[in-house]
């Protein structure tokens, strides 16, 4: 019988996921052997795929696009973060056989900004671009840092307005945004196709940090635009990716990985 602990990331598509390499580095830090695989679940077949994984020795799983809401629905119990976000990116098999859903996206983002990059969030004005699942998942943890104001802006304003009411933050139409933001976070997926959010360069004039939740080349169009428009510092989402993975690993195994060397390792791949 295979006694090596099994973990996985579920998504569709998922072949591009860097999670296996990241978790392998965490296991090396802990000094253990784990299995970590990518599982491409069929649209409409996510719940069955998760059930089969846990029935065959799975201990925990990460969940990425487009299954985070479905992961929330199938979880038997939820962390406060997951309840606040309405989405789950981490599934934990409990000793009683039930599945607990958590959301570590917000921890990954705020740890990266506040700890690794050393940028203050409390009493600052934060702009979130986009109103999808990625943004929804980070708002509850951002609020714990007590920023002076959180503003959300999205191509479809109604979606941003709905999220603003839900989280008690502000929504402003993209074309009405002006300056005055300390931290600007791009949570749109436009960078994957080279598109920029339809915003004025003026929004970056007093910006301490422009941050893109995606990483690598996909983040570069937005970050280059931010730099040219006056942002003092820019960062892609690699630290967030490693940070949310580290939080998941800690929930599964009770071991807190050191994020910094893994960010460096992934950057050099």
Curated annotation (Swiss-Prot):
* Any one GO cellular component localisation term in the record: cytosol
GO BP terms in the entry: amino acid biosynthetic process; aromatic amino acid family biosynthetic process; chorismate biosynthetic process; shikimate metabolic process
A molecular function (GO) term: shikimate 3-dehydrogenase (NADP+) activity
Gene3D superfamilies from the xrefs?
Answer: Leucine Dehydrogenase, chain A, domain 1, NAD(P)-binding Rossmann-like Domain
**Positions with a binding annotation for shikimate:** 17-19, 64, 89, 105, 215
Q: In which pathway does it act?
A: Metabolic intermediate biosynthesis; chorismate biosynthesis; chorismate from D-erythrose 4-phosphate and phosphoenolpyruvate: step 4/7
Specify one Pfam family.
Answer: Shikimate_dh_N
Q: Which HAMAP family match?
A: Shikimate_DH_AroE (MF_00222)
Please state what the protein is called: Shikimate dehydrogenase (NADP(+))
Instruction: State the organism of origin.
Output: Neisseria pharyngis
């Amino acid at each position: 019988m295979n006694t090596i602990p099994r973990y996985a990331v579920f998504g569709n598509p998922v072949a591009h996921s860097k999670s296996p390499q990241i978790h392998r580095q965490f296991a090396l830090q802990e000094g253990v052997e784990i299995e970590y695989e990518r599982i491409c679940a069929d649209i409409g077949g996510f719940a069955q795929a998760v059930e089969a994984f846990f029935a065959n020795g799975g201990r925990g799983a990460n969940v990425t696009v487009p299954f985070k809401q479905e992961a929330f629905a199938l979880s038997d119990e939820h962390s406060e973060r997951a309840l606040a976000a309405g989405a789950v990116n981490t599934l934990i098999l409990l000793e009683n056989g039930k599945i607990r859903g958590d959301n570590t996206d917000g921890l990954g983002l705020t740890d990266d900004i506040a700890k690794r990059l050393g940028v203050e969030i409390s009493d600052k004005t934060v702009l979130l671009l986009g109103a999808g699942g990625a943004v929804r998942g980070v708002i509850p943890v951002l609020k714990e840092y007590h920023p002076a104001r959180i503003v959300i802006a999205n191509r479809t304003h109604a979606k941003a307005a709905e999220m603003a009411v839900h989280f008690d933050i502000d929504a402003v139409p993209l074309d009405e945004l002006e300056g005055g933001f300390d931290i600007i976070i791009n949570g749109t997926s436009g960078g994957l196709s080279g598109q920029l959010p339809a915003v004025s360069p003026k929004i970056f004039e007093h910006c301490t940090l422009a941050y893109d939740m995606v990483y690598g080349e996909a983040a570069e169009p937005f970050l280059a635009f931010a730099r040219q428009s006056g942002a003092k510092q820019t960062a892609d989402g690699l630290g967030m990716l490693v940070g949310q993975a580290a939080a998941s690993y800690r929930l599964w195994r009770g071991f807190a990985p050191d994020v910094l060397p893994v960010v460096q390792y992934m950057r050099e791949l």
